[in-house]
Amino acid sequence: MKKSTKVNAAILIIGNEILSGRTQDTNTSTLATWLNSIGVIVKEVRVIPDIEKTIVDTLNILRKENNYVFTTGGIGPTHDDITAQSVSKAFGLKYETHKEAFKILEAYYKPGEFNEGRQKMAVSYTHLTLPTTPYV
């Protein structure tokens, strides 16, 4: 991380659907506006595909150059949503089922709706802290 008196950040958008144009990025403007409002300078925004090596390599580059890196995309229930496991790999953290997240999701879905794809959303890297707000 470069030494600076100002706090800076990068935004890393992950998803083939963004790159193909099938989905429009709606997160960057909101996130950058909020970060700037609290004094964090957004230095860079990158859009990359759902490829583990690309995610790991890009994340490692950005975290060396910025105080913070915010990722969006790739955390849903589909097979190509590999952001969490890629973040785990970049930081050398274990990737496993988060018991508390699993319980929350299981309680949220109706019986029979908490399928394998949705259960995947409870798998993440160790040291994960769940948000305490009821809006997430």
What are these regions (language model features)?
Residues M1-S4:
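Basic/polar N-terminal segments that are highly enriched at the extreme N-terminus
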Residues K6-I38, E44-V45:
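Glycine-rich phosphate/diphosphate-binding loop of Rossmann-like nucleotide-binding domains
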Residues S29-K89:
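N-terminal small/polar loop signature for handling phosphorylated ligands or for N-terminal nucleophile
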Residues V47-D50, E100, Q119:
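Short beta->alpha linker loops
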Residues Q85-Y108, E113-G117:
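Glycine/small-residue-rich loop that forms an oxyanion/phosphate-binding "nest" at active or ligand-binding sites
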Residues G112-L128:
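Short, glycine-/small-residue-rich phosphate/pyrophosphate-handling segment
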Residues H127, T132-V136:
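Single conserved hydrophobic/aromatic residue that forms the stacking wall/gate
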